[in-house]
């Protein structure tokens, strides 16, 4: 059977229903093509009109989930924000995505790679998000630390939030504890310490504005 090209409504339904199942079941493990096809309302062999195999469907779902993640990260960011406010909003978004979307977060960052090989375009998308995060952390740091230190600051903050998030989505937290709030509070403390920000002082936004996240199909402001 030859594989069709294009992105018709049936292909879209397969991707969307895959993401719905991932959301409902807390990840992609245990989901199979027959389950997805049942949600679409067709025989599972119909999927091969659009995808070479189930792994290809999962990678298409990964692309869509990454766009949702990118869109989530830029919500509330504005060029007029002082540096600390911009940083606080950014880490709030980093911390709230796993809490709001535990299944998608596990799917994107804590599950086996489909087929063991990451497609080049997915690597490119992940690379663009990381580059933007590095640039954003450099921008909010002003000239108080150099770019290499800002990159370390980004890696430390992101790694900390990821670690807390994995505990959160795996239920390894105290019931009722505001984990996202704690992540933001600790990240802001790290920010003020590493960037040597003076208490009570407002640091204006950079003259050219903050860096923009440019991804096809995702918001950029």
Which ranges hold each PLM region?
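Amphipathic alpha-helical linker/stalk segments
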Residues: 3-4, 64-87, 135-137
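Append "Primarily bacterial transcriptional regulators
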Residues: 34-38, 47
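Hydrophobic alpha-helical segments that form the core
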Residues: 146-170, 178-190, 208-210
